[in-house]
């Protein structure tokens, strides 16, 4: 019994594919930021330019969407964007694992955003935060109905926030695996002479599309976080 418990405790600390590749992603982010800011120059190099471009892009997004008072939370949003982006890109490496295709990973991030902005809304505005659900511009008879819809849509946010990212990352990889399954057909049949080149071209096209999707999904998750932050900072309709 004692030995069994020891094994279970040991296995608890064994890293999974998800934790391993998330750790690699964090190390890559740290490397980018350290190398990009280590020797700052007036005429930036490639890595410094990449770091500054990413920083400026997210800084402007937070300011435009959440307002200047939302810049207080810029470090968190910037870190979130980089983590998702690098996790998405890591999945494009052959034999690698995509942490953001795991609903447990995206679910934790989405719930963190949801709980954080909700707590922030109540801390800053108290009960006035509930004005977010009261559409004062609508006709009075419709306001209670719209309030119920707003409440439901608010609590659905973490679900849609997490599933959108995980689903898109998982779907793209699944399609690539389907095309890859047709690639070896040239070894087994005459039909493969036609099918295999088409499969290879499809894989290349899908890979290029997945690079775009990796960035777009990181952008979508981040900008939605900014929108939710804006609702917490300025809850009135």
UniProtKB/Swiss-Prot annotation:
Listed InterPro entries: ATP_synth_F0_asu (IPR000568), ATP_synth_F0_asu_AS (IPR023011), ATP_synth_F0_asu_bact/mt (IPR045083), F0_ATP_A_sf (IPR035908)
Subcellular location, record wording: Cellular chromatophore membrane
Membrane topology: Multi-pass membrane protein
Keyword annotations: ATP synthesis, CF(0), Hydrogen ion transport, Ion transport, Membrane, Transmembrane, Transmembrane helix, Transport
One GO cellular component, as annotated: proton-transporting ATP synthase complex
GO molecular function list: proton-transporting ATP synthase activity, rotational mechanism
Pfam families per UniProt: ATP-synt_A
Record field: transmembrane: 18-38, 77-97, 103-123, 132-152, 185-205, 209-229
Subunit structure: F-type ATPases have 2 components, CF(1) - the catalytic core - and CF(0) - the membrane proton channel. CF(1) has five subunits: alpha(3), beta(3), gamma(1), delta(1), epsilon(1). CF(0) has three main subunits: a(1), b(2) and c(9-12). The alpha and beta chains form an alternating ring which encloses part of the gamma chain. CF(1) is attached to CF(0) by a central stalk formed by the gamma and epsilon chains, while a peripheral stalk is formed by the delta and b chains.
Membership in a protein family: Belongs to the ATPase A chain family.
Primary role: Key component of the proton channel; it plays a direct role in the translocation of protons across the membrane.
Protein name: ATP synthase subunit a
